[in-house]
Amino acid sequence: VINFNMLLLNPGEPAVIKFITATVTEILDNYNVDAIHLDDYFYPYQDIGNADAATFKRYRYRNDSIYSWRRNNVNQVIRNIHLAVQSHNRQKNRKVKFGISPFGIWANKKDHPQGSLTKGLQSYSVQYADTRKWIQQNWLDYIVPQIYWTFETDAAPYAALVDWWASTVRGSKTQLYIGHAAYQPGKSERWNNPHELANQLRYNTRHPEIRGTCFFSYRSIFAPDNKIQRQAMEKIILEYWKYPAKTP
């Protein structure tokens, strides 16, 4: 699909799902990788309009809406990658993991009864990424939601989202790691507290479901570009990174 001056792989096409699965299999067969990791790109954040209308007409299932059809397309991609990784592990006696780092909001509670107490963009309906289903189906070994907001962000408060993700993975086989925005301190008034990230790490300890944290990006940690960012990372390094971390 060509849209917004970009070339996008259309997951509504069976050939695309086959291609993505084959690419993952090629990586598994030829490289000694620890994991297959996907970032937060599924359907684009921008509305693609009717760019995939012909594919929808050709492959829709019964009375599916285009929205549920798109979600199912992404589900098929995720399931196929999961199966490819599992097959590789059985055949090669390996323990390669499959994980995803999605946008931090699955759905808002006002639009979906199982959603979080948020008012932001929803990956379920914008990117057609049903991350909650992937966890319930145990298709993921780990998930790293990008919770790139502060405790005081009205539309997406940090604590509400951490609580939601911890509750969502509870009882599943999917391990939860929280994605933190190391690049944000000092970039806006809301991020002017150098203790924000450290407070987030402290809050994480309330939930035994949280196995660890990930930061974006490496550059912000080791080459901070403003005073508040530097203070934020120094606090984490001195208080939280004094000891070796356990390997997931």
Placement of each model-derived feature along the sequence:
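Aromatic- and acidic-residue-enriched carbohydrate-binding clefts of CAZyme catalytic domains
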Residues: 1-10, 46-72
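Alpha-helical packing segments of well-folded alpha/beta enzyme cores
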Residues: 16-27, 73-84, 130, 161, ...
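Active-site-adjacent "subsite" loops/lids of carbohydrate-active enzymes
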Residues: 1-26, 30, 125-126
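Substrate-binding cleft of secreted/luminal carbohydrate-active enzymes
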Residues: 128-153, 171-248
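Soluble non-cytosolic domains of exported or imported proteins
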Residues: 10-18, 64, 68-76, 125, ...
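Substrate-binding cleft/loops of secretory-pathway carbohydrate-active enzymes
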Residues: 37, 46, 92, 97-144, ...
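Aromatic-lined carbohydrate-recognition surfaces of secreted/lumenal glycan-active proteins
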Residues: 37-41, 68-123, 174-185
